[in-house]
Swiss-Prot record:
The gene is rplA. The keyword Ribonucleoprotein applies. It comes from Streptococcus equi subsp. zooepidemicus (strain MGCS10565). Binds directly to 23S rRNA. The L1 stalk is quite mobile in the ribosome, and is involved in E site tRNA release. Transmembrane segments: none annotated. HAMAP family: Ribosomal_uL1_B (MF_01318_B). GO terms for biological process: regulation of translation; translation. This is Large ribosomal subunit protein uL1. Coiled coil: none annotated. Belongs to the universal ribosomal protein uL1 family. Part of the 50S ribosomal subunit. PROSITE patterns: RIBOSOMAL_L1.
Amino acid sequence: MAKKSKQMRAALEKVDSTKAYSVEEAVTLAKETNFAKFDASVEVAYNLNIDVRKADQQIRGAMVLPNGTGKTQRVLVFARGAKAEEAKAAGADFVGEDDLVAKINGGWLDFDVVIATPDMMAIVGRLGRVLGPRNLMPNPKTGTVTMDVAKAVEESKGGKITYRADKAGNVQAIIGKVSFDADKLVENFKAFHEVMVKAKPATAKGTYMTNVSITTTQGVGIKVDPSSF
């Protein structure tokens, strides 16, 4: 614990908490100040001036990062017949129907993404209390309720991320790993930032983005100046 505290202090000394860095500087600092013993994730966090209690100010969606996330996603698909075969051919890790519902209700959660064809949502709905709190419930807005299961599986395996504003208007997302080249992290950040800019609700008032920062799994938060690119 003492060693970790010392590492954190050293990391904090490298970052000026009063300064907003360019995205290139922020990414470089994030890599330099990471002290995790594993290949930590690089994350972005947005504080948005929105009121998610209003239906037209809720922000939720999905996108495919140009350079992926560096994480191998375990994909589960609820489908039957030809669609189940399509999912398997596309590389889904688990495909099924009621058998998977029973398994999940029994405590099994060894998957990262859940996809379902529309006709399967009646049985998937039984898992609301399990999948909902973990942000795993399939949703048309994130492209996880679809008849094109092959595309959904391929995107999930190829760097697709989902995002959603919480009650306080905060949005967090993984944009890669510390091991990524800095330019790839910058490209991923810019792609996600463009999505966040376009997601601004028409009814939002005042400054939309009140804070943008980059951090690693065990690193320090580094403020980013959105006007730097």
